[in-house]
Amino acid sequence: MSLYSAEDILKWLHHAQAEFLTALAEGDDALAQFQAQWDRVRACVDCDPTLPSSTLALSHAVGISIAQIAEVMLDQEATNHTIEDELTKDLLAGLERHDASSALADEKTGAELSATPLPPYIEPCYRWLVNHLDNPYPTKAIKEELLDQARQRTSPDVAQHLALGDIDNWFIAARARMGWGDIRRRLFGGSRSLMLQSTRLMWGTEETSRDFTDGCIAKRKGAQPKREEVQPHLRSSHDVVAFKIPPKASPYFLITDSSTAACEEPLHPQSFAALQPDVEFALAHLEVNAKEMYGLEPTELADSLNSSAVDRQFATQDLVAFRAALEAATAAKQRQARREQRRAQKDRMDAQRRAEDRKCYPSPEPLSADELSGTESDEDLDDFYASDDASDDEDDDGEDLDTRPSDLMAQMCPQLVATAFSKDGSATEDEDSNSDDTDESTDDEDEDSDSENDSDSEDEEEEDEEEEEPVKIAGAKRGRNDDEEVSPLAKKPRIFSPPVRPRPQAIRVSLPSPAPSSRGSTPTSPVSPSPKAKRPAQATSLLASHPMKKREKLQEELRKAGLAPPSAPVLMGPDGVPLGTVRSRSSPSVSSPPSVSVSLPLPSRGVPSGGIKVTGDPTPWVNWDLEAHTQAPRDLTAATKSSAGCSVDAVPLPGKSRSLTRSPSISSISSACSTSSSGSDTDSLFSVTSDATDITEPDEATTADETTTQSTSASSSRDTTSQQKRMPPLSIDPRFDPALWSKYDLSPPADGRLHPSDGLRPSAFVPTKLDVRVANLAQNPARHWSASKRSPTRASHAAAPIVSYHHATGSIASPAQVAFGEGQLTSVLATGQKAGNARRRTTPVQRRVTPKAQETSEPSSLVDGILSSGLADVCREAPKPAKAPKNDRRYLERRERRLSKSSPVDSADTVRTRLAEIEQEAARLEAERQSLQRLASVGG
């Protein structure tokens, strides 16, 4: 029968862990009682088979937890014993070491004390010195008194050898050891009287004779002098504050009644900062040195000053190291300056050589599209122009050096490309080798001159080593002189005579031969230009030389050349190129068919009511006749075929020509014989090489009757074959008609399908045709307004020369009465994101200084039509009214300027003003064009 029931066992198990922890805290007796109780419960659990499984599991879990706690406690106790033993051992070892060191110190002190006895006069003299630090200069009577005291302390034999000079010498040495003379020279300029006055203020006065302990650093606050005793040069900056605000608990208050103690004035206010801080600290340091001279009791500043003081030996080493580093840095700086001087001299010589090279260059050729893509970046061009500017500023006093046009050919800008010429390879190699010899001789002369001027041979050796420093980058090529270690003294002096270079020979360029007379002869068929094309047999040699100019002058001349119209009479060569025009070079590595990029921004998904605005650069070398009023107007119709895209087609009006022709210009040689040419497609300006589409352009010399017949037949055949239902034609402004600037049929089924959702590029296109791009302005109108780019080469080798102006490049020339002016407006609007800032050429500072241009009083209806059609983005939101401050007269002007900068587009007034200015400029250009045409018609 068990001693405990199942309920008692379960209850005890629930409280077993708490009772165990309590027993651990109480001690060994409580643990013994818990152990006995645990044994009895354990026996009952083992003997009673009727206990449920939950009670057995609980007893097992409680036993495991108690066992783990007991194990942890045992480990902790063992660790504590180990730590206690280690600490005891360390403590005993430290005590033993301390005892041994103390014994050694005692032995050393005893040996020092018993080595040599001190002279008998040192003790009385030293005691007097310590008590009279305010005036360590004893009088003769005091010296005799100290001498008598010393004789009384020693034997008669030693006393008879003592003299007054021994005491004088000791005081001199004592003042030097405690730093008296150093402080007097450093702080008082060697004045003994000023130093004595400071020491009296520090430690006492002449009237009071007291022991030094009464006036030490810790007790000298009660002996402060009055204000009138302090000299002006010894007063502190805090002296006035100390006199005005005395402490409340000052011992110098005259108190008559305890109730009125706080209201009384001090009888003699004292100064609490009579000396300057640096003087006071120096005197305190002097006191410390005096107290430590013979090992007496250390003062309160002894430990702190000793710990902060720096040993003289270490201070000397640091000073020597600092001086050595300073000398090394100075020498390195001098070597760097000499290297920079030699480098600058070499750069000047290179600049002079480049200037001589540019003088013999011929006239540049225009770049092709392939070569333009392979030119240098803008950063290289900027560096090139910067070097040119630097070379122009230098004096041309150098000798004529050799020219290397092959090295400088890659540095030419895209606008000025050196004409290709042929030279013998052997001559080029000789010139290159001569130029290398010149560079080497120049470097050697520089080194020789430096070795003569520099007297320090070691410095010269280090300089030569650093001048030809080997490359440290892995994989880099090593110089040819890297392994040579020859000192400058071992080099043999070489004397070079100045090299005599021949003047560069003139470069001759072969140009096309002049064409036969345009009257009475028919021009030959144009031949497509190619890099392998042979030159005519009869070629004229032309001496061409064109010096390079600065970047600013070059841009200004190019701008003026683009604005100025060409001369009216232009003679054409047999190959269709104007005489005097140098053929463009094409890259042999990349061969791509000529194409022209044209942008067709659409304001919406469908065809706008105002027509399609065509921008870009169709071809600046093609001259479209602005007087071709007989051409057929074109209409656009739109038919939405699917949600994926829209189809835009150009459909002719009934009875008009479907084939778009181009009338020859006044300067084209083909204008005199346009009726003699036949309408064949084989001699078209562009050849079609695509197998998918075989579309060619009609000949430009087709007569009006043939054009009408062809257009009628084409339109009738197209109407019969097309079964799609089209929308009624929309009237289009003539300036937006693509038929007026291109003689190609921009039919979407043939030339490509337009996708307004993503790009805006056609899916299928003939490579040699125009590259048409359509943009949806409703999605992102600001992204598609980009500046037009001039094509660097001709799109057609047989095209007529330029008669349009630079501003009208890429615009649409309309056959209307004001066609040129409207095309001018269209071109300017397409050159920038903001119409008001499209043609600005001045800086903001110049615009502020320059008076504003007067606004056109009555702009034409064309300006209002452009603003209302949505071609130019303007700011529709009216600015909020603001009241200008009285003191700021230009507040409104600055506010308007800030608003214009924050807005992506200009205001309507700004755009209207700019359009009016463009309209006036277009009218002026139109009048000039008409005058040129009249001059050309009369022959000069």
From Swiss-Prot:
Indicate where this protein resides in the cell: Nucleus
Q: Where is the composition biased (Low complexity)?
A: 516-531, 582-611, 657-693, 704-724
Pfam families, sorted: Homeobox_KN, Mating_N
Domain of life per record: Eukaryota
GO function terms (MF aspect): DNA binding
> Per the record, which residues fall in region Disordered?
333-618, 633-762, 832-863, 877-912
- What keyword terms does UniProt attach to this protein? DNA-binding, Homeobox, Nucleus, Transcription, Transcription regulation
Q: What is its main location?
A: nucleus
Per the database entry, where does the chain bind DNA? 110-182
InterPro entries to which the protein is assigned, alphabetical: KN_HD, Mating-type_A-alpha/beta_1_N
Q: Which GO terms describe its biological process?
A: regulation of DNA-templated transcription
Entry GO CC:
nucleus
Q: Which Gene3D superfamilies match?
A: Homeodomain-like
Which residue ranges have biased composition labelled Acidic residues? 376-400, 427-469, 694-703
Q: Where is the composition biased (Basic and acidic residues)?
A: 337-360, 877-896
Describe the task this protein carries out: Specifies A-alpha-4 mating-type. May regulate the expression of genes specific to the homokaryotic cell type.
Family under the similarity heading: Belongs to the TALE/M-ATYP homeobox family.
Protein name per UniProt: Mating-type protein A-alpha Z4
* Native source organism of the sequence: Schizophyllum commune (Split gill fungus)
